Design a protein with these regions (language model features):
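Short catalytic/ligand-binding loop motif for oxyanion handling, primarily in non-cytosolic enzymes
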Residues: 12, 37-38, 100-103, 128-132, ...
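N-terminal beta-strand-loop-alpha-helix module at the start
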Residues: 1-67, 425, 434-440
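A structural preference for short, hydrophobic beta-strand core positions in alpha/beta folds
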Residues: 29, 69-72, 119-122
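Beta-rich, aromatic/charged-enriched effector core domains that present basic-aromatic interfaces
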Residues: 75-196, 368-373, 388
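C-terminal catalytic domain of photolyase/cryptochrome flavoproteins
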Residues: 45, 65, 189, 211-440
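Structural alpha-beta junctions
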Residues: 23-25, 62-66, 112-121, 204
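A charged, amphipathic alpha-helical module
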Residues: 152-254
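Residue-level signal for inorganic ion chemistry
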Residues: 21, 92, 135-136, 233, ...
C-alpha cells in the first residue's frame, strides 16, 4: 500500500508524489488538515478557501481515475500513529515544501521516522536544495529541474474501497466549511483556472507586463495572477516555465515574457533562503536589527492593517488587498516600507498580519521581502517609499483611489495625493516627511 500525502501540491497534472505513488501499486491519497497549521504564522481563511477550491478539483479529477481523495484531520504525529495502526507496511509518498516553522518542525520528525524505516519517497519541489546547499551550482540545478519532462497523466486505477480507515471524504469535509463560503471576491483556485490564466497571460495579457506591473490600476489584469496557483501547487512551476519558454520565440512581446522569466527564478531564490535559514521567520538577517524598533504599538499597527492611516492611496491599497487577497509587488513593498519606516513598527508584528491578507502567501518570498523592505538584512540599502509620490505616479487622476474609497469622490486629485482632506477623512497617522527623515 502506498500513501500519497498532499499539502501545497494541489493538482493531478505533473505531481511527482501523486504520479509515482499511484503508479506503483494501490494508493491512498490523503490531504492532511491540521487546524494548528492554518492558525500558524501568516495563515488565514482566504488562503484556506483557495486550497479548498484546488482540492475540490483534485477530488473530481481523481474520482474519474477511480481514486478517492481522503482527509486526515490532525497533525503529523497523529498521522504517523494512524498509519502505523492501519497500514504498518505502507510507503509514504510526498513532495518537499519550504513552509512556516510549524510545518517544518512537525514534518521533519515525521519524515525522519519513515526515512529510518526506508518507507519514504520524497520529491523535489521548486528546485530547492534541501541538503548541502551550494550557491555556485544553484542556478544550473534549477535550470535542470525546470527542463525535466512533464510527467505523464496518472493512470486510471481499479475501483478502490477502503473500509474502516476512519478518514473523511473530501465531500463530507468540505460540507462543514461554511465560513469560507462567504469569501467571494478573491481568486478561485484549481487546475482549470491556473491553465486558463497561464494561457491568457502568455498569449495576450503579458503585453506591456514589464511596465504595467508597477501600477495597481493595471497590474490586476497585466500580471499573470498565477502566484496563488504556484503557492498552492494547482500548477507546477515546471509547467509554467516550459510553457513560457515555448511561447517566447513567436511572441510579439518577448521583453515582457523575459521579465516574467526572471521572476520565476527569483521566486525559488527567495524560498531557498528560508529553506537554508528557517530562523528568518522570526529573526532578522542582521541580528542587531531585532530590537531596533521596540515592541510595537498595537493601535498604530491596527490602523495600518485596517487601511485607516489617513493617506488615501495607502488606505485604498489596503482596501483593495482585503477584498481581493492580492495586490501588485510595488504596492506590497510600499505598504511594508510605510509600516517599518514611517510608522517604525517591528516587522515581526506587522509581517504575519500582512501575510494573512495574501491569498498567494508564500512564506519564503514574503518573509525575505518583508525583511528587505524593513532594512534589517544588513545587505540591501533601505528604500523608503513616498506614499504621496506613489499616489501621483500610479493614479494621477485619483480615479482608482476613489473606486476603493467612494467617500473621496468629491475631492480633487491634488488634495487626495497630498492627503489634505481636513476633517472629512481620517487624520494622517504620521508626518510623511518627518517620519521618513527620522527613519533614515
Amino acid at each position: 500500500m502506498n500513501i500519497v500525502l498532499l499539502h501545497r501540491d494541489l493538482r493531478v497534472h505533473d505531481n511527482p508524489a501523486l504520479f509515482h505513488g499511484t503508479s506503483s501499486g494501490s494508493a491512498l491519497v490523503v490531504y492532511v488538515y491540521d487546524k494548528s497549521y492554518w492558525q500558524g504564522n501568516g495563515k488565514s481563511d482566504i488562503q484556506f478557501k483557495f486550497a479548498m477550491d484546488c482540492l475540490s478539483e483534485v477530488s473530481d479529477r481523481l474520482r474519474k481515475k477511480n481514486i478517492p481523495l481522503h482527509i486526515f484531520e490532525g497533525n503529523y504525529e497523529n498521522l504517523k500513529n494512524w498509519i502505523e495502526m492501519n497500514f504498518s507496511e505502507s510507503v509514504v509518498f510526498m513532495n518537499h515544501f519550504t513552509d512556516i516553522g510549524y510545518y517544518k518542525k512537525s514534518t521533519d520528525k515525521f519524515k525522519r521516522f519513515y526515512a529510518d524505516l526506508k518507507r519514504l519517497k520524497i520529491y523535489e519541489n521548486f528546485g530547492i536544495q534541501t541538503k548541502n546547499f551550494n550557491r555556485d551550482v544553484w542556478s544550473s540545478n534549477w535550470q535542470q529541474i525546470m527542463t525535466k519532462p512533464i510527467l505523464p497523466e496518472i493512470k486510471t486505477s481499479s475501483p478502490m474501497v477502503f473500509k474502516n480507515i476512519e478518514l473523511n471524504t473530501f465531500e463530507n469535509f468540505s460540507s462543514k466549511l461554511t465560513l469560507i463560503k462567504q469569501i467571494t471576491e478573491s481568486q478561485v483556485g484549481g487546475e482549470t483556472r491556473a491553465f486558463e490564466l497561464l494561457n491568457t497571460f502568455l498569449k495576450e495579457r503579458a503585453n506591456g507586463y514589464a511596465l504595467k506591473m508597477s501600477s495597481p490600476v493595471e497590474a490586476e489584469f497585466a500580471c499573470s495572477r498565477l502566484s496563488p496557483h504556484i503557492a498552492f501547487g494547482s500548477i507546477s512551476l515546471k509547467t509554467v516555465y516550459q510553457s513560457l519558454i515555448e511561447a517566447i520565440p513567436n511572441s510579439f512581446f518577448k521583453k515582457d515574457l523575459y521579465s516574467f522569466k526572471k521572476r520565476l527564478h527569483w521566486h525559488c531564490h527567495f524560498i531557498q533562503k528560508l529553506e537554508t535559514e528557517p530562523e528568518l521567520e522570526f529573526s532578522s538577517m542582521h541580528p542587531m536589527c531585532d530590537k531596533l524598533r521596540g515592541e510595537g504599538d498595537k493601535e498604530i499597527i491596527e490602523k495600518w492593517i485596517k487601511g485607516e492611516t489617513g493617506f488615501p492611496f495607502l488606505d485604498a491599497c489596503m482596501q483593495f488587498l482585503k477584498k481581493k487577497g492580492w495586490i501588485n509587488f510595488r504596492m506590497r513593498a510600499m505598504i511594508m516600507s510605510f509600516a517599518s519606516y514611517n510608522l517604525w513598527q517591528p516587522w515581526q508584528k506587522t509581517s504575519p498580519l500582512l501575510a494573512q491578507l495574501f491569498v498567494d502567501y508564500e512564506p519564503g518570498i514574503h518573509i525575505c521581502q518583508v525583511q528587505m523592505q524593513s532594512g534589517v538584512t544588513g545587505i540591501n540599502l533601505p528604500r523608503i517609499y513616498s506614499v504621496n509620490k506613489q499616489s501621483r505616479d500610479q493614479d494621477p487622476d485619483a480615479s482608482w483611489i476613489k473606486s476603493q474609497i467612494p467617500q473621496l469622490n468629491n475631492f480633487s486629485a491634488n488634495s487626495i495625493h497630498n492627503a489634505e482632506l481636513a476633517e472629512t477623512y481620517k487624520e494622517i497617522i504620521c508626518d510623511p516627511k518627518a517620519s521618513a527623515k527620522k527613519a533614515r
